[in-house]
Regions:
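Short glycine/proline-enriched turns and hinge-like loops at secondary-structure junctions
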Residues: 87-90, 122
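Conserved interaction-surface patches within small, structured recognition/assembly domains
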Residues: 72-87
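A short tyrosine-centered beta-strand micro-motif
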Residues: 89-98
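Bacterial Sec-dependent N-terminal signal peptides
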Residues: 1-24
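Primarily secretory-pathway and cell-envelope proteins
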Residues: 21-64, 113-186
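Covalent nucleotidyltransferase core used to form phosphodiester bonds in nucleic acids
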Residues: 97-100, 104-108, 115-119
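Peptidyl-prolyl cis-trans isomerase
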Residues: 78, 110-112
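Pre-active-site segment of Zn-dependent metallo-hydrolases
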Residues: 66-67, 78
Length: 187
């Protein structure tokens, strides 16, 4: 009886120890932040890999909503009002979704529900902003989904998403003049 109890405890402790081990994730987490004007814009996302799969039109079907990454929906955090493709986006935290309508037109959605795991519980009525963009052929294929900022100037930047053989660019503008006024008033 004692040997059975000891065997059970040893087996249980081994099982608990294995469960506590952290292992590499297939789609590791990442974030990128850029100061634009006087505000920080942050993208938090998970990086799925191509892994010899067809991405566009297959893994990510055309005309269906996609979480713009893996695991939890990709997050866009802005600390002040900005413009995306000349459309206003108030400061806040948003989930980013993408509908690849076709090979030539995509809809990017900034949604106010920020605790979504995937796109299953997405609700259109929570959309803050939708913009249309045209994906372009990437100069080199990207194995793991990547967001990064390019063409950074004092008041603007381009947010690029690269994965597989495509790239999507979003023009972001900040209005530092309005933020300067707020800073002066709060001083």
């Amino acid at each position: 009886m004692i040997q059975i109890l000891i065997s059970t405890l040893v087996g249980l402790s081994f099982t608990l120890g294995v469960q506590a081990q952290e292992l590499p994730k297939p789609s590791p987490s990442a974030s990128v932040m850029q100061r634009i004007g006087l505000t920080d814009v942050t993208i938090e996302y998970s990086r799925p890999g191509v892994n010899d799969r067809t991405i566009w039109g297959d893994l990510v079907p055309y005309n269906e909503i996609w979480r713009a990454g893996a695991n939890k929906a990709t997050q866009v955090i802005t600390l002040a009002d900005i413009k995306i493709e000349n459309e206003s986006l108030p400061k806040g935290n948003y989930s980013l979704f993408i509908i690849p309508v076709s090979e030539k037109e995509w809809t990017l959605i900034f949604n106010k529900e920020t605790e979504l795991w995937g796109a299953g519980d997405y609700k259109k009525e929570m959309d803050q902003l939708r913009v249309s963009v045209t994906p372009i052929k990437a100069s080199t294929p990207t194995e793991r989904l990547e967001y990064h900022f390019t063409d950074v100037s004092m008041n603007s930047a381009v947010l690029s998403m690269n994965w597989a053989d495509l790239q999507v660019n979003l023009n972001i503008q900040a209005n530092p003049t309005s933020q300067v006024k707020v800073n002066i008033e709060n001083a």
